[in-house]
A protein has these predicted regions:
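Phosphate-handling catalytic cores of nucleic-acid transaction enzymes
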Residues: 2-470
Length: 470
């Protein structure tokens, strides 16, 4: 076997690389602790209990409680920003966690009162259906069909959401401990992702949403609310967050994302049950009080939430935070300017949710709630910055790392496709795979192609060859 540089070119085109080599994977810096004590005591106390009993990551617990609170509060109140705009109190939360991080257990505990509410509504629906069936046919045909009772939806399309909100409850939650099903499902396929993102963005904004029905035209949905909390594994979540179409559309700027440190390997057995503690009883009672209603619904089945105002000290704090964030958009928050541009609105939304969790009859956002919202928003902006340049871990990166390790250990300046196909890692010896991976390595300035015929292998000039950065 011979590997030599021909003298076709007097000066090889390989002097000087265009840039510093880029890592195949960017390692995440450690996550900051979730500020659990920024939540109202009725939530924070239960959050600490869930964390202690389930030993799940802290932000997984915090996000679950915050999402659950938003779902309970959103039918009742909007919040008026100091400049006059009135916005919903819906929150969109995304938790990133590996398999086995107790996502389902945490979700079940946070949403237990919501599941009981949904079960109660389902029972009412069944009773109404049976009563309707007992009516004389002529009278039954004049009676409205009982509405659907779905309150918690796991992976619907926007079309499915519109149908649920039209035929059922005017406020629902998209909550899933297996959010990868939603992120990778039909609603987020290449053809449907933009439509799904646009629809979810409109729901977050509180704007009317078009509902197109085959056969009977179109209508608009007014007065509907959607809260969202998706838990997903890193590969699915980070690939979704790297989608350039969705980045440009603006959905991500409406999402509060956390990727906490794993607790795997530290979870020794503990016999305590979170749902049998006084903190659980207090949390369930407060959520049940909020969910019980009655919801402010008009004759058109549209929500008519009252408006919480931000005044006095809370207003001054909001304005101060607004100005600080706005100035930072040109500096340290430049990489997350989408979320940063909505951070002041999110401050108001979170503060309103926390206010109602403390006092369901409140009419003004409290300064304590605004202080807590500031702490929480700082956490989410920090998480967004931490995740802003992270590449999703996927098989292509793993395989590229495998090939790069072989090239580095081989220690030769030039390599050809036939040599890699013959002697490279056994898993990577198909020409198509090798070309794809060498492109990845080239994009990271670890290799670069050389002109046809410049390198010989086994006595033949090769068309496909690369220089290796050693």
């Amino acid at each position: 076997m011979t590997l030599s540089l021909t003298n076709v070119l007097e000066t090889p085109p390989t002097d000087g690389w265009p840039d510093e080599a880029l890592p195949l994977r960017v390692e995440l810096p450690p996550a900051e602790p979730f500020p659990m004590d920024a939540l109202p005591a009725v939530m924070a106390d239960y959050g600490h209990v869930i964390q202690r009993c389930s030993q799940a990551p802290d932000a997984l617990v915090g996000n679950s409680l915050l999402g659950a609170a938003s779902l309970a509060v959103q039918p009742y109140v909007n919040v008026q920003l100091p400049h006059g705009a009135i916005v919903p109190t819906s929150l969109y939360v995304i938790s990133v966690a590996e398999s086995g991080e107790r996502k389902s257990a945490v979700d079940r505990l946070a949403l237990h009162p919501h599941a009981m509410f949904e079960k109660s509504k389902s029972g009412e629906q069944r009773e109404a259906i049976e009563e309707r069936k007992r009516l004389p046919k002529a009278e039954m045909e004049k009676t409205e069909v009982p509405r659907e009772a779905v309150f918690l939806a796991s992976d619907p399309t926007v079309e499915g959401l519109c149908k649920l909100l039209y035929n059922g409850l005017p406020s629902i939650g998209v909550f899933s401990a297996e959010g990868g099903r939603f992120l990778g499902g039909y609603g987020m396929s290449d053809d449907a992702s933009l439509r799904t993102a646009a629809g979810l963005s409109l729901f977050w904004d509180g704007a009317p949403v078009d509902r197109v029905r085959a056969g009977d035209g179109a209508s608009k949905l007014y007065g509907r609310r959607v809260a969202l909390h998706l838990m997903a594994q890193p590969r699915a979540a980070l690939q979704w967050l790297q989608n350039p179409i969705l980045k440009d559309q603006g959905l991500f700027s409406r999402c509060l994302i956390a990727y906490p440190q794993s607790t795997a390997g530290t979870r020794l057995f503990r016999p305590e049950r979170a749902d049998e503690t006084p903190a659980a009883a207090n949390y369930v009672a407060r959520m049940a009080e909020l969910l019980a209603g009655p919801w402010p619904i008009d004759e058109f089945h549209e929500l008519k939430p009252r408006t919480l105002r931000i005044v006095d000290e809370a207003r001054e704090l909001w304005i101060d935070q607004h100005n600080q964030i706005e100035q930072a958009i040109a500096g340290e928050l430049r990489e997350v300017r989408g979320l940063a541009s909505k951070a002041a609105e999110y401050l108001a939304r979170i503060a309103a949710v926390l206010t109602l969790m403390n006092d369901p009859a409140a009419t003004l956002v409290t300064v304590d709630a605004m202080k807590s919202a500031t702490i929480l928003m700082e956490f989410y902006l920090g998480e967004a910055l931490r995740l802003s340049n992270v590449q999703p871990k996927h098989e292509q990166a793993d395989l590229a790392m495998m090939l790069w390790t072989w090239l580095a250990q081989r220690g030769k300046r030039y390599v050809t496709l036939p040599e890699m196909a013959q002697f490279g890692p056994a898993k990577l010896r198909k020409a198509q795979t090798l070309r794809m991976l060498m492109n990845v390595l080239s994009e990271h300035y670890l290799v670069r192609p050389v002109p046809d015929g410049m390198v010989e292998y086994n006595g033949k000039k090769r068309r496909e060859a690369w220089e290796v950065r050693l």
